[in-house]
Swiss-Prot record:
The lineage of its organism: Bacteria, Pseudomonadati, Pseudomonadota, Alphaproteobacteria, Hyphomicrobiales. Belongs to the universal ribosomal protein uL15 family. PANTHER family: 50S RIBOSOMAL PROTEIN L15, LARGE RIBOSOMAL SUBUNIT PROTEIN UL15M. Binds to the 23S rRNA. The keyword Ribonucleoprotein applies. Pfam families: Ribosomal_L27A. One of its GO terms (biological process) is translation. Signal peptide: none annotated. It comes from Agrobacterium fabrum (strain C58 / ATCC 33970). This is Large ribosomal subunit protein uL15.
Amino acid sequence: MKLNEIRDNEGSSKDRIRVGRGIGSGKGKTGGRGVKGQKARSGVAINGFEGGQMPIYRRLPKRGFNNIFGSEFAVVSLGRIQTAIDAKKLDASATIDAAALKAAGVIRRVKDGVRILADGELTSKVAFEVAGASKPALEKIEKAGSSIKLLAVAVEASE
């Protein structure tokens, strides 16, 4: 086989249908768009318009709200931290905080702080300095002989 002998598989690509090229083509005149009306015209269709039926965004109820005072944490599991320590991305002898986790590539954005969850196992003895941790995570950290310092989340007071 040579480069000039390479061909696409039979039936792998279809020719596109050229519409509006004469009545004899079968797709001429209206070009498969029916007769007149908004949907027969050129240009982009109106977003969310479903031809007159009640659109999905009006059929479904409104739900929830955005809490402007809520805190959003970067969540990380003990297993991921242990994997980073094993891969020598995190130094177990140094304090592990948000900056260290970000530098190691364990989290992408710090947001309002880091919260540790109990997924996976922690075998290394480490010192944590984070904004929060789940109860099972705290138990696993203490069981591994590690220490954790929970930082207060900075919340701006509104007047």
